[in-house]
Amino acid sequence: MANENVTKQNGNICFIEDTHKYFDITAPEKPFISVTTLIHRYAQPFDKEFWSAYKALEKLLSKDAWTIEKKSLLNTKKFDKEILASYNISENDFNAAQQGILDAWAEKNRASCERGTQIHLMMENSVYGSDRSKTLKKFGVGGKFECKKDYTELDLEHGVYPEYLISRVSKDGVLRLAGQIDLLIKNGNEILIGDYKTNEKIDLKSGFDTTTKSNAKMLYPLNNLMDCNFSHYQLQLSTYAWMLQKINPEFIIKDLLLYHIDHQGNETLYHCDYLKDEVERMLLHYKKQIIKEQQKLKRQRIEY
């Protein structure tokens, strides 16, 4: 990996924006998993094929016909194209409608990512410039804070670290975790972690799962948490907090904050719980999975 492609670096750990990859310059062959990618592994998988078919059928059916079919589809979470003949819908028309749904999703995701990147850059620059105190006030922080561009040592008494690259490698080298904290504020040993979210909305609860008759939960061992983006974000900030306390056990996590800017420009601040127990369960489970995969590969190598 060429150094000229590096977007950000903290010690030996580097990040490349184009590929969204983290690596150690002393051992680039050993992969890191990002905090957000790891958390996504424990979210319920999104069946894009089913849900695009579901939305396409909704678009093609009358309101009364859709009311009849909707319940069955939600109960089974399976789509059989034989249903099309019952309503004289050609497969070509259905495929076109489904592709239209998929294309709309892809465009919405592209536009959302572009908007998010622009807002993150704007917020980062505001912390370096004269608007620093104004930005910090959004997180309920006042007073004089120091901010040095590309400075990574966590030794400023009253310091602000925007887009802070953080990593953790377990002593045995099995767990290799990295991520970027949008806004790290250090006041003595008190730590505030802020994160900017620019998606359409923050879901505080997950949808109702008709098979379990309860709100959808994340996958084991996080099945005590609702499977909604607020839970995912709480885990993200909690993982950053856990990593910081591994760097310095004297750090006190004062607050974990989500600063949400919706698509209408409305700004909302959410306080998150520090889910330390859940983070440690997740990391232990993931580490066990890595070890199992490594053992499986070793067994395959000795087979003849």
Model-inferred region functions:
Residues 29-30, 63-71, 168-176, 249-251, ...:
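Intrinsically disordered, low-complexity coil segments
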Residues 52-56, 60, 213-215, 289-291:
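Short, surface-exposed secondary-structure junctions/capping segments
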Residues 93-104, 219-233:
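Glycine-rich, flexible loop segments associated with nucleotide phosphate handling
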